[in-house]
């Protein structure tokens, strides 16, 4: 019997990571512990608009650059 995969390989900010099968980009942010209100996401060299985060599935081999905004003086 063949074992079903439950995780997929992706790249986040240049580091190899895994994501749950069928995860959305919003799920990925939660898994990484990031505040979705303070980040911008590039997926496969294209900016991913915030309204699409909960609709966009993480796919094997996706490359993400996630930039966090930090306030300060």
Description of each model-found segment:
Residues 1-72:
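Ubiquitin-like/PB1-type beta-grasp interaction modules and other compact soluble beta-rich domains
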């Amino acid at each position: 019997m063949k074992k079903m995969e439950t995780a997929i390989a992706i790249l986040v900010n240049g580091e190899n990571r895994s994501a749950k099968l069928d995860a959305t980009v919003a799920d990925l942010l939660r898994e990484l512990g990031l505040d979705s209100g303070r980040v911008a996401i590039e997926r496969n060299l294209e900016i991913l608009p915030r309204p699409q985060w909960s609709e966009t599935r993480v796919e094997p081999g996706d490359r993400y650059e996630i930039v966090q905004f930090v306030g300060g003086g």
